[in-house]
A protein has these predicted regions:
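Short loop/turn segments at strand-loop or loop-helix junctions that form parts
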Residues: 1, 123-125, 178-181, 211-216
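Nucleotidyltransferase catalytic core that binds NTPs
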Residues: 1-86
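A glycine- and Lys/Arg-enriched "phosphate-lid" helix/loop adjacent to the NTP-binding pocket
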Residues: 64, 192-241
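Surface-exposed cleft-lining segments at the edges of enzyme active sites
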Residues: 87-91, 134-152, 182-187, 221-226
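Glycine-rich phosphate-binding P-loop
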Residues: 87-106
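Conserved substrate/cofactor phosphate-moiety recognition/catalytic segment
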Residues: 106-162
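Glycine-rich phosphate-binding loop used to anchor ATP phosphates in small-molecule kinases
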Residues: 152-204, 213, 220
Length: 241
């Protein structure tokens, strides 16, 4: 809102009104601004002035936009979820994705300030893999006797996204993700082939991908991984998509 430019003020009011048409009825505008009364009139709302001296909330929205990182702790959970950068580490098995993700989290936390609460998201698919393996062992079967299904990957995608969103709402400006929904889709293709059903997610401006490489990284078999030879082809899958 620019009180010195009536055309801009009216244009901003029209944008807000357009958004309000998709929400429950609103009749009150709460601001800490000296021009709150005037802007409320443009919107046809009542105005309530809250903390105009900024003693309870010592910052303005302009200041937050100018330095988002320093003011991160003042954002609400919903704003954090929308604005947090998702640093996503993906790659074939035994290429160091978890090690790298944890190392980046550690380095960010050393910066202190709002980075001290940097969250790390574990790979839920690994949890489910262990459960399926234990299920097979309990029945006296080979671990391959309990096949992967579409429902398994739907569960992984849903839970992985939930874990990520909770971490964004409660942590610092960057969320360190040891995989995400996109990687889940690549693994679904690997195990289900033409039966894979998960759709590719849309583009996200706050998501940065890092693909870990097998070069020089020894393959460590932890009893749930595929073969070492598969690492090369899976790495290409991640890079190509």
């Amino acid at each position: 809102y620019d009180p010195g430019n009536s055309a801009v003020a009216k244009s901003n009011a029209r944008v807000i009104e357009a958004h309000l048409r998709h929400t429950p009825p609103v009749d009150l505008l709460v601001t800490s601004e000296t021009n709150g009364d005037e802007f409320a009139k443009l919107l046809g709302l009542h105005h309530h002035s809250f903390d105009p001296d900024r003693t309870q909330v010592p910052v303005s929205s302009t200041q937050i936009r100018e330095d988002l990182i320093s003011n991160w702790h003042l954002l609400g959970p919903g704003s954090r979820e929308l604005l947090a950068i998702r640093a996503v580490f993906i790659g074939a098995e035994s290429t160091g994705t978890t090690t790298t993700t944890l190392a980046v989290q550690s380095e960010l936390m050393k910066r202190q300030g709002n980075f001290a609460t940097t969250n790390w998201i574990r790979e839920y698919g690994r949890d489910l893999t262990m459960r399926k393996k234990e299920q097979a062992e309990a029945m006296g079967l080979s671990e391959y006797a309990v096949p992967w299904t579409t429902n398994d990957f739907v569960e992984i995608a849903i839970v992985q996204q939930q874990l990520e969103d909770v971490a964004a709402r409660t942590g610092g400006p960057v969320v360190c993700c040891d995989t995400d929904v996109f990687a889940t889709i690549i693994w679904e293709r690997r195990y289900l082939g033409e039966k894979a059903a998960l759709p590719m997610p849309g583009d996200s401006q706050n998501r940065i991908y890092f693909v870990t490489q097998p070069d020089g990284v020894p393959f460590v078999q932890d009893k749930i991984r595929d073969s070492e030879e598969l690492r090369i082809s899976m790495t290409r899958e991640f890079e190509d998509d």
